[in-house]
Amino acid sequence: MDKSSGLDFINQMFPVEASLSCVESFMQKICDEIRRVDATILAVVSQQGNSGTRAKENLNDAICAAEELSHKIQEIKSKAEQTEAMVQDICSDIKKLDFAKKNITTAVTALSRLTMLVSAVQQLQVMTSKRQYKEAATQLEAINELCNHFKAYMDLPKIMELREKLKNIKQILKFHVFSDFSSLGTGTETEELFLLKKLSDSCLVVDALEPSVREELINNFCSRELTSYEQIYVGAELKTLDEIELIYNQLSCLIRKNQGKWTIFPASWHVPYRLCIQLSRKTRVQVESILVNLKEKSDVEKLLLELKRTLEFERELEMKFGGGGSIGDDIIGGGGNNSQKFNFRGMISSCFEPHLTIYIEKEEMELMQLLEKVVQEETWDIEEELGCHSENSVYLMLLDAHDMKMILLKVPSLARQPEASALLVKTATASYVKLVNHQMKRAEAVLKVIASPIVTVIDTYRALFPEETPMEFQRILVLKGLTKAEQQSILDDFNNHSSRITQLSVAAKTPEAHALPLALTNVAPAVRFKANSEEVLTRAASAATTSFMKLYALTGAAKDRPFRKLFNP
């Protein structure tokens, strides 16, 4: 406490002089307070000394407890290591026991399956001797399943012995099945019905054997069924078209007679289809031989009749044994597939195609005769009043040309077969459309120039025929029905304004209009490629004779004779 503070305290305690009378009592009070504080300090110091002693004792106790805990931890660690070693020993023993259990289980299972296999082979041997095909098929499937479990033990003597025994039993089964099939058709009707049921069961056995056995059985059966057909026609000298009908009748009779017998085979084998494929191939050879060996030119009507009968026969086969889908020439391989569909279109009838030339020649001859008739019936006197009738006729011919173009473009699809290759159809159709468009474009251009007014005929001609000559332009003016004076006036104007032509061509050229019939004559290959009957050619020829033939006749005659009323309604 500084001096000022002490003075302030004294002044506060003794503000007036009269208060100094209480100094002694005040001093006594202060002394008592000092003694109390000293006693408190002494008690605290004494207590603190006792606390240090207790703290040292507590520290010693804690050190002892820590040492004891460390000792116990060491003991626990030691016991844990001992326990771990014991567990490892136990696990090792358990693993050995697991391997032993697995080996024992495998051995027991293998022995059990071996017992079942031995028993099944013995039962199969008994069934084979009794020709119990249905039971043998089920047993053979079970044996094949059991044999799959012994693939890893094929070198064991017992397994090799069983395999050899099973192989011999399968050979015996195969022999019995083939023997029963060879006896088909040699017994009475009752015996045949019983044998058919038996052979139907034997097919189950063949399915359980190797695939090669099934193929061999099918080939043998087909060869046997074809024997009667081959005895009649193979090697025989066939010369006339009438014999084709006899062949189809014989085939239809053979199919009807044996169709019930073919049902013994599973559908997945496709035996009727494969048999009919072979029949169709042999028939194709015979029909082709007849067509090649014809000594004189065959009658078109009779040839088309036999072609129609061939197509009908193919449709009959397809309805009974096909279903549409893949190409008939593709013989199915082994194994079969229920999802496959087949057809017989074109297998026999395709051999007629090289011999249809006479039909095409006949159609061309009839078209040319009709063309000549149309030309001969026309008179070529000039009529001054032609006028609007000519223009109306030209517009009508433009419509006819457009309709004819649409008909020609539809020709490839009129009798298109659904199973034809998409790429082949697309390529053929594209080339055919290009040909028709090219040929018809020029015909339509000629008609448009003819239909144009006189004042714009030059501009129309230059726009549609930029590379043509005045000679071609003059011929179109003739077709337009103009007088010579009108033609000369227009030609002079054409030559004066032409930057490319300096003089009229006097060389004798074939008129371009003569190329127009190509749109008709080139239709024949496309029709032959896509159509199956003469209906398509008839429709195309009919359309051509209504309008396009008129244009062809007109352009051919316009070179030397004046225009008449060919365009009149």
From Swiss-Prot:
Superkingdom to which the source organism belongs: Eukaryota
Main location, first listed in the record: cytoplasm
Compartments where found: Cytoplasm; Golgi apparatus, trans-Golgi network membrane; Endosome membrane
Keyword Ribosomal protein (UniProt): no
GO annotation, cellular component aspect: cytosol; endosome membrane; GARP complex
Pfam families: VPS53_C (PF16854), Vps53_N (PF04100)
Any one GO BP annotation for this protein: protein transport
Coiled coil region boundaries: 53-90, 125-145, 295-316
UniProt KW keywords: Coiled coil, Cytoplasm, Endosome, Golgi apparatus, Membrane, Protein transport, Transport
Membrane-protein topology: Peripheral membrane protein
Record-stated family: Belongs to the VPS53 family.
Task performed by this protein: Involved in retrograde transport from early and late endosomes to late Golgi, leading to the membrane fusion between late Golgi and endosomal vesicles.
Subunit (UniProt): Component of the Golgi-associated retrograde protein (GARP) complex.
Protein name as annotated: Vacuolar protein sorting-associated protein 53 B
Organism lineage: Eukaryota, Viridiplantae, Streptophyta, Embryophyta, Tracheophyta
